[in-house]
A protein has these predicted regions:
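C-terminal accessory domains/tails appended to large, multi-domain proteins
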Residues: 1-281
Length: 281
């Protein structure tokens, strides 16, 4: 499991542990602010937020194209090399960076999918571990079900919301970060995509001290776009609300704000953010 690999190979700090460390060090106000942010994240349908301090990244280039950005249409030209040599040159950059791992709440996802008619609802007293097992059963099913597709697309859309909101609460813009999607676990890792130099600790500070503002800003922006109603009803998202210039694993394909707020090209009955508000403790 990709998520298990992150916890096994990287330095990952849970916000609960960070809050405890703050209190033990005499920083009660910072701990209170962090705990308030964790509650706000829960109310926004987020189960956990973790700080990843040494995420390994390797960028490898083996060709280029100036015609099509779509991988299925592009025909790559190899990097210059000796044509007598059967080997192709690769250009690679290896580094470690920092990121924030965000996981959507499995039980809230289950309730959201049920409200939209994609699956039967959970029982009233469904424990968290059962909801997590349900999530994996759905997302690893072959062929992909409507439920799995919805989980994949809402995870991707939520990831872009959070990337867009970074500019208001950190030293990074949406062009300075990238996403590593773990859609089968309804998770996304947003990491710094500046590989030569960056301010180490910038994202960690965001998660530890400004989590509430970051999440509130992201979720509030989902409900409207300057290009509405065309953006939501016809496209599902645009560069003003969801799309990013760099850092998207899917080249901004499949983004649909309707999965977050309802409506959109797929005419989603109820958005995930609305469900999260309704079922929040």
């Amino acid at each position: 499991m990709e998520r298990a690999f992150l916890f096994a190979e990287c330095d990952v700090d849970e916000l609960n542990d960070i809050s405890t460390s703050m209190r033990n060090a005499g920083h009660a106000q910072l701990a209170d602010r962090l705990d308030k942010g964790r509650v706000g994240a829960t109310n926004a349908g987020i189960a956990t937020v973790n700080v990843v301090r040494d995420f390994p990244v390797a960028l490898v280039g083996y060709g280029y194209t100036r015609e099509h950005a779509s991988p299925d249409r592009a025909r790559l030209a190899p990097l210059p090399h000796d044509r007598q040599d059967t080997r192709l040159p690769l250009v690679a950059i290896e580094t470690r960076t920092e990121g924030i791992l965000v996981e959507l709440a499995p039980l809230t996802l289950w309730q959201w999918c049920a409200r939209n008619g994609w699956c039967p609802p959970p029982s009233v007293d469904t424990p968290e571990e059962v909801a997590r097992a349900w999530l994996l059963d759905q997302t690893y099913a072959e062929p992909e079900t409507d439920t799995a597709a919805a989980i994949r697309r809402v995870t991707h859309a939520y990831s872009h919301l959070l990337m867009h909101a970074l500019a208001y609460h950190s030293s990074y813009s949406s062009n300075s970060v990238a996403e590593y999607l773990l859609e089968r676990q309804a998770s996304t890792l947003i990491y710094v995509a500046k590989y030569s130099s960056f301010n180490l600790g910038g994202l960690a500070t965001l998660a530890e001290q400004h989590l509430q503002r970051w999440v509130d800003s992201a979720t509030s922006s989902a409900w409207s776009c300057v290009h509405d109603p065309i953006c939501l009803s016809e496209r599902g998202g645009c560069h003003k609300c969801l799309a990013v210039t760099f850092g998207c694993e899917r080249f901004n394909k499949g983004l649909d704000r309707g999965y977050l707020v309802g409506g959109g090209p797929q005419d989603i009955r109820e958005g995930y953010l609305f469900t999260a508000q309704q079922v929040a403790p």
